[in-house]
Amino acid sequence: MKHWILLLYLGFSVMLRAQNTASVQEAMANYDYKTVIRLIDEESASPQLLIQKAKALKGLGRTAEALSTLQHIIIELPENQQALVEAAECCRQLSKFNEALGYYRKVMELNPEHIYAHLQYTRLLYNYQRYGDALRESIALARKDSSATVLRLMAESMEGAGMPVESMFCYLSIIRKYPSDYLSVAKLGSIFNTMKDYEGAIALTEAYRRTDSTNVEVNRQNALAYCLRKEYPTAIKRYQDLTARGDSTLLTCYYLGVSYYAT
């Protein structure tokens, strides 16, 4: 009889825990973070649920608390890659540069094929202007993932490291491989404009506009090239299109004014 009671108790406990986990997942899916935290705090939570709690805390802007929760998990489970990645994300938000790099590096040591951790590690190096390190890592990453995102990060690192010609060739190779990558088109267009190669900027951006004439980033470089080349009527039309799409940035308004004044 006692065995039956024990089995019933265990079965009931498992059922309640499963129901609670399902409720947590539903609340997370609905971004109802307060409910997530309340449900998890009501029971002795597993590491997986504590990670969900950390995500909820981060979603509510309580990033320091989220990091503390994750650090407790990492003490108990130092090889939990999800907890390590989430801790790195929290450190990034809290401007804890070295700590974030350390967490990403740990994930990369545990799993050298972890593309996301390697990408974020490299991007963090770039954001903190460690361009040489970012270039080295982006080259290594490109051997595993030749996506436009990775190749663009390589080109940006070259640009930051004072390698403008190499970065131009890198952007060109990206555009040939991924013609729809508007960020690379805009970046290369910006380089052409900086070098006063306005014809190159116009040719590049007009080629992209033939498939998508609405992209704000590309149209900014296109309009700027026309303005700096003193083709003011076309520049005005491009800038008017930009402002009609809600672009009220300082440079757009400034060069629209310059174009009007020049005519």
What label would you give each PLM region?
Residues 29, 59, 93-94, 127-128, ...:
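Register position in tetratricopeptide repeats
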Residues 44, 78, 112, 145-146, ...:
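Short coil turns that delineate tetratricopeptide repeat
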Residues 48, 82, 116, 149-150, ...:
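Start-of-helix register in tetratricopeptide repeats
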